[in-house]
Structures are given as C-alpha cells and as structure tokens.
C-alpha cells in the first residue's frame, strides 16, 4: 500500500506520460502523412511531365499496380492531396492543444509564439501596402 503522497506522485507521472504519448503519436502521424503527401506530389509531378493524356498510366495501390486513365489518376491524387492537407492541419491544431496541456501538467509556462498563425494573402497584401506607404 502506497502512502497518499506516493499515490499522488504516481498519478502525476501517469498523467504526464499519457499526455506525452499522445503528443508523440500525433507527431508520428503528421510525419507519416507528410511522407505520403510528398509521394503524391512526386506522382503529380510525373503526371505533369507526361504529356500523353490519352494513354493510361500505372498507379500503385499498396502492393498492386492498376492501369488508370491519366486525367482520372491526376484528379484522384489531387483529391488525396487536399484530404492529406486538411488532416495534417487538423493534427497540428490538436498537437498545439496537447502540448499546452502537457506543459500545464508539468507546471511549465505556455510556449511563447506557439499559437501564431501565418498571414493569409489578403493580410499580407494589406501589410505590404502599409509598409510601402
């Protein structure tokens, strides 16, 4: 039987470990999805170089190659890219929340600048106008 102090420390360590595992799992998933996104980008680039739109192309699905029409293949890869972009963005947002919870559990201050978001095109144009003018 553990003392109340030892139980409290044990609960704290378990909580921190669980949060850290979630952070690491999300990071790993982001890396895996980014790798897939890069492979898709390579495939799209190869399709752009191949100017014969009438011929079918060979596409690898897992461990199987399938012959598909060029336009359908390009459209399918582009849709997959959009899905991967959305999934990676969702995971990154989740990761920020999980890292903040982990830091909070450890008693560390929140990361400065961690919640920054990039400027969109309109904001960037407005900033350039202000700086020039």
UniProtKB/Swiss-Prot annotation:
Keyword Transmembrane helix: no
InterPro entries: PDRG1, PFD_beta-like, Prefoldin
Location(s), subcellular: Cytoplasm
GO cellular component terms, A-Z: cytosol; prefoldin complex; RPAP3/R2TP/prefoldin-like complex
Main localization (coarse): cytoplasm
Keyword Cytoplasm: yes
A GO biological-process term: protein folding
One Pfam family, short name: Prefoldin_2
GO molecular function, one term: unfolded protein binding
Keyword list, A-Z: Chaperone, Cytoplasm
PANTHER family per the UniProt record, alphabetical: P53 AND DNA DAMAGE-REGULATED PROTEIN (PTHR21162), P53 AND DNA DAMAGE-REGULATED PROTEIN 1 (PTHR21162:SF0)
Family: Belongs to the prefoldin subunit beta family.
Role, per record: May play a role in chaperone-mediated protein folding.
Subunit relationships: Component of the PAQosome complex which is responsible for the biogenesis of several protein complexes and which consists of R2TP complex members RUVBL1, RUVBL2, RPAP3 and PIH1D1, URI complex members PFDN2, PFDN6, PDRG1, UXT and URI1 as well as ASDURF, POLR2E and DNAAF10/WDR92.
Designated name of the protein: p53 and DNA damage-regulated protein 1
Organism expressing this protein natively: Bos taurus (Bovine)
Phylogenetic classification of the source organism: Eukaryota, Metazoa, Chordata, Craniata, Vertebrata
Gene, per the UniProt record: PDRG1
